[in-house]
Regions:
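N-terminal glycine-rich anion-binding loop in soluble enzyme alpha/beta folds
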Residues: 1-68
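Helix-enriched interaction subdomains in cytosolic or periplasmic regions
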Residues: 73-110
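Conserved beta-strand elements of the Class I
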Residues: 10, 130-134
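A short, well-structured juxtamembrane/interface segment
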Residues: 71-73, 117-118
Length: 134
């Protein structure tokens, strides 16, 4: 087994309990696989009670930045081989949270910025579009 065989996708669950499951299902559905063994290795870790409310933090109703707990989940995923991590939570991509996560996680781990990636996709796939509504 070479080192590429040990690499896997990590998914942070627990921020919207079904969001992590939904992301994993979408990855499976988009994977071209003739057998079970052809699927991409994925690990999802969902520890919702450990990650504080993102909105409460951003509104100043809590001093606890959820970045700390999210970073710990990423660290655990990294230890079991995840080298690219998906975080299916829009609120966790807010600058005060996301930037703190980036500062805390291992440098060899790529945390996908979901919003930036969607923006890149739209620009590449639909270059004439100037405005996008959410």
């Amino acid at each position: 087994m070479n080192t590429d065989d040990k690499k896997m996708i990590g998914v942070i669950g627990g921020m919207g309990p079904h969001a992590g499951i939904d992301l994993v299902q979408k990855i499976f559905n988009q994977t071209k696989a003739a057998s079970d063994q052809d699927h991409l290795p994925i690990a999802m870790l969902s520890i919702p009670h450990s990650i504080s409310d993102r909105t409460e933090f951003l509104l100043g109703k809590s001093d606890v930045n959820p970045a700390s707990a999210i970073s710990e989940v990423i660290g655990t995923l990294s230890k079991i081989g995840a080298c690219i991590i998906g975080m299916p939570c829009n609120t966790a991509h807010a600058t005060p949270i996301f930037n703190e996560i980036i500062e805390r996680i291992p440098k060899e781990v790529k945390l996908v910025h979901m919003i930036n990636e969607v923006s890149k996709f739209i620009k590449n796939k639909y270059p004439s579009i100037e405005n996008v509504g959410i």
